[in-house]
Swiss-Prot record:
Record's protein name: Protein DGCR6
Organism from which the protein derives: Homo sapiens (Human)
Biological process per Gene Ontology, one example term: animal organ morphogenesis
Family as reported in the entry's similarity comment: Belongs to the gonadal family.
Alphabetical list of InterPro entries matching this protein: Gonadal
Amino acid sequence: MERYAGALEEVADGARQQERHYQLLSALQSLVKELPSSFQQRLSYTTLSDLALALLDGTVFEIVQGLLEIQHLTEKSLYNQRLRLQNEHRVLRQALRQKHQEAQQACRPHNLPVLQAAQQRELEAVEHRIREEQRAMDQKIVLELDRKVADQQSTLEKAGVAGFYVTTNPQELMLQMNLLELIRKLQQRGCWAGKAALGLGGPWQLPAAQCDQKGSPVPP
C-alpha cells in the first residue's frame, strides 16, 4: 500500500513539474515577443524549453539574483575608485596652480620667463601622469568587469542554463544579456517555485497576462 501511495505521489510530482514547465515556457514565449526580431529568431522553442527546465526549482533565480547583487557591488566599488582618483587629480591640479601662482608673485620680473617655462614643463608632466593614471584605472575597470562577466557565464553554464558559456563574442554576449533579461522579468513577475521564492514565501504563479480571471493558465 505504501509503495502504491509512493508511486501515486511520484506521478503527481511529475504532473506538477510538467505543468510548471509548461507555464514557464508559455511565459518565456510571451516575453520573447518583446525582444528585437533578430534575437527572437535565435531563441528557438528548444532553447526556451531548456531554459524553462533549468528554472523549474527556482535555484537559477537565486543564482541570478546573487550574480546581479555581486555585479552591482562591483560596479559601485569601481565607480567609487575612479571618483576618488578624479578627486585626487583635482586636488593635485589645485595645489600645483596655487604653488605656481605663489612662485610667480615672489619672482623678480626678469626671472619670470624662466620660471614660467619651468612651471609649464612641470604642468605637462603632471598632466601626463594624470592621463596615465586615468588610463590605468579605466583598464582596471574593463578587466574587472570582463572577469565578472566570465564568472557569470561560467556559473550559469554550470547551473545548466541554456545559452550560457564563457565567450567574448559580442553577438553571443547580447544574446546572453537578453536571456538574463528574460529571467529577471520572470523573477519580477513572480514566476518561481514557492520553495525557492527568494525568501518571499509566495506560491509559484504566472504573470497576470498569462492567467484568466479565475487564475487558470491561458494557452499561448
